[in-house]
Amino acid sequence: MSPSGKSSRSLANIAGIVAIATLISKVFGLLREQIIAAAFGVGTVVTAYAYAYVIPGFLFILLGGINGPFHSALVSVLSKRDREEAAPLVETVTTLVSGVLLGVTIILVLGAGIFIDLLAPGLEPETRRMAVQQLQIMAPMALLSGLIGIGFGTLNAADQYLLPSISPLLSSITVILGLGVAVWQLGQQLNTEPYWLLGSLLLAGGTTAGAVLQWLAQIVPQAKAGMGKLRLRFNFALPGVKEVLQVMIPATLSSGMLYINFATNLFFASFIPNAAAAMRYGNFVALTPLGIISNMILVPFLPVFSRLADPQDWPELKLRIRQGIMLSALTMFPLTAILVGLAIPIVQVIYERGAFDAEAAAEVAPVLAAYGLGMFFYLGRDVLVRVFYALGDGNSPFKVSLFNIFLNGLLDYLFYKPFGTVGIVMATVGVNLFSMTIFIWMLNRRLAGLSLGGWAMDLGKLVGVTAIASVAGWQGSVLWQRLWGVNSLVENILEVLTMSSIILVVFTVGVALAKVPEVDLLGDRLWKKFKRV
């Protein structure tokens, strides 16, 4: 809504709501992944699901996720308008988007086999058959993703942050219930060939059912907020519709380029045994804290960026951009230190049970470490993209993403043979680093200077502190293994907690000595939250 109509909630309050709600969702997501890992390990069923989920899952994250282009476009436009203008605008955009995505759903159902063959030409016949069936079951998520993304955007614009952040747990609950009952009844038999089809259908069906529940959960709150009801509206001449599409279409295409990169990664991964499953498990562990923190940073900052788009407000906009980048570094770098230094014990704690054995843990751990190295570049890129959206420019991110397709393919080709699965992940890290660098250069020119010398100096200090903290945790873990070994889950958990604490202490002392201004800002926010609790 317009600034005058918005709630007076502070950035810290919004970030706190989003963080707590997202944390709850991520806990359920972690439980879902643990059940999947215990039931199927890194074998045939999970590999098939990893490929079948690529298109519907990507659409669900891209279009239906918080901070996606649909969410960002709606927030950017509605935050500048009065509430009475919202309902017809939202209903019109929903009608238009639903028509397009219904067609996409039909295409996915009819062409499932073709899409799987394009994504993974190296799959075994049985794995391919399961992947095709799973894709057909999950195809409706294409339509649901658009409806959910629009709903999230409208609820955020109405100053409602809890439901959009917590509703993803519904997608986890349905999978947990379905697989949980199957594991309870069948045990390890579920991962034997006679039950592979049942397991794959439970995975796909539970995922789709969760998406349906997620959409249904937002309909009533959206209507009560006066942000549109479930009705068709064809008033495409509304001025706001054009404004939304001017941001939404380039942003969707730009983000869609990431899908092409992801599909390219999986194309090369199909020639490496168990690579897709290893990437799925490693990616989830990295994305769990990343998702929580990215929502804390991106959700409250996007409306702020939008309200500072006028040239006379650019001095404050540049300050906010720096804050977004530095807060990303201060929150991501300690996680990078932990995931890189403690990759093996972390994977053992989270996944090593049932069908997921020590050999599977050894496959996933280096992949997790590689994802950990790229966390800051992923989040920093997203912060900068939101600045372009706030400025009404979806074309610049699109052009960069278009070039990144070729860069990602080249890096995948160069890295996948010598480095295996880790090489594919590092190709993605390289692409995100390149994107972030280009976006900073473009904004520096567009906003007449960003004081990049100061940025580089402070980021350099934080990188050094991160390296020292990670080495401290890694060496501490090696010493722990020599002195006590690890003979149980409890001992493994104690090792991870102890070494993570050492890493955080070293990092905290290091950043305090580095005297980065945003350290005090982050500390003040955390202290205020602690006092409220």
Curated annotation (Swiss-Prot):
* Membrane topology listed for this record: Multi-pass membrane protein
Keywords on record: Cell inner membrane, Cell membrane, Cell shape, Cell wall biogenesis/degradation, Membrane, Peptidoglycan synthesis, Transmembrane, Transmembrane helix, Transport
Q: Where are the transmembrane segments?
A: 11-31, 39-61, 96-116, 135-155, 166-186, 196-216, 253-273, 284-304, 330-350, 360-380, 400-420, 422-442, 452-472, 493-513
The pathway to which it is assigned is: Cell wall biogenesis; peptidoglycan biosynthesis
Is this entry keyworded Cell wall biogenesis/degradation?
A: yes
Q: Which GO terms describe its cellular component?
A: plasma membrane
InterPro entries the record matches? MurJ
Q: What is its main location?
A: membrane
Recall the GO molecular function terms of this protein's record: lipid-linked peptidoglycan transporter activity
Name one process (GO BP) from the record.
regulation of cell shape
Cell compartments where the protein resides: Cell inner membrane
Functional note: Involved in peptidoglycan biosynthesis. Transports lipid-linked peptidoglycan precursors from the inner to the outer leaflet of the cytoplasmic membrane.
Q: Which family does it belong to?
A: Belongs to the MurJ/MviN family.
Q: What is this protein called?
A: Probable lipid II flippase MurJ
**What does the record give as the organism's lineage?**
Bacteria, Bacillati, Cyanobacteriota, Cyanophyceae, Synechococcales
